[in-house]
Amino acid sequence: MKLIVSKNFDKKDSYKIDTYIAGGGYEAVKKCLESMKPADIIEEIKKSGLRGRGGAGFPTGMKWSFVPKESSVPKYLAVNADEGEPGTFKDRQILELDPHLLLEGIMIACLAVGIHTAYIYIRGEYKKAFDRIEAAIAECYAKGFLGSDIFGSGYEIDIHAHAGAGAYICGEETGLIESLEGHRGQPRLKPPFPALSGLFAGPTVINNVETLACVPEIISGGAEKFAALGTPKNSGTRLFGVSGDVEKPGVYELELGISARKLIYDICGGVKGGGKLKGFIPGGLSAPIMTADELDTPLDFDSLAKAGSMAGSGGVIVISEHQSIPKIAARTADFYAHESCG
């Protein structure tokens, strides 16, 4: 299987611009500037079948197309890097190990939607990730990849990194917007939806880190190749962050549709210490727990929803026979009461 999002993770100095360029980086955004119209970019993303990797799995190309082509006020892109849900840590890998992949995805999204300003909202505890993103942005400005004339094209894109303050609720898209504007991070009532009136009352696209990191490969390699991975309605790969009672925890890039059994046992070595599996959480702490009898469920958006859980943020938490489900439920309730109520 071809790695898309994690292909540079093991390279020396993977976070530096010269390493990224040497591996073909920024060729996709150049292709967009030289030979693709905004509508062409959106159509390619639609054909790829890319769905949001942050939770709901909404089709990315469709989300981009909701933003008005003409606007009397500036349009914005807000990148949700506020990875605060327990059991979720995949986006941190992209931010720390391949920040330029994210930046190129942001540039392409801006070209597709007619945006000139993007903000990356990074979890407050992710100090190393924030520093890596800031350094990568500075490298892009130094080479003329960002600013008033990107790649000599005459198009202007500015990207800003913004550190949150550790509030989980700011991972909700309108709470994130409120925080970016300098207000208390409290979700807004919808409508209006961000695509029409979001950040600073302008039309706003909000995408997850991993979602945007998929975009350069779709443009450079073609939508068909991306769509050939995964399943017909759940195309591409996904980063799975595996934790809990498991032998080999970590972040793994795999095709959507892989079974929980194959991920937990074949790839991650099974339950820690050879114990028995009691259950697993497939998409971060907010996803309903699944039982050992459901191990053959494909880990994709539609299959997990049909099973009564959700793909969520891709955080797979393994639960052994030694854990108490009532205690896990109580701790989960405590977390959400503290972070989302009052």
Summary of predicted features, one role per range:
Residues 1-48, 115-120, 236, 274-275, ...:
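Iron-sulfur (Fe-S) cluster-binding modules
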Residues 20-26, 80-91, 194-199, 241-246:
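Gly-rich Lys/Arg/Thr-decorated short loops/hinges at beta-loop-alpha junctions or inter-strand turns
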Residues 28-44, 73-75, 81, 90-95, ...:
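Ferredoxin-type iron-sulfur electron-transfer modules in oxidoreductases and energy-metabolism complexes
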Residues 33-75:
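N-terminal glycine-rich phosphate/pyrophosphate-binding loops that anchor nucleotide-derived ligands
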Residues 47-59, 168-170, 278-287, 309, ...:
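Local cysteine-cluster metal-coordination motifs and their immediate loop/turn environment
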Residues 98-112:
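Histidine-anchored nucleotide/phosphate-binding helix
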Residues 105-109, 256-273:
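Short amphipathic, charge-patterned alpha-helical segments
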Residues 130-256, 268:
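Hydrophobic alpha-helical positions that pack around
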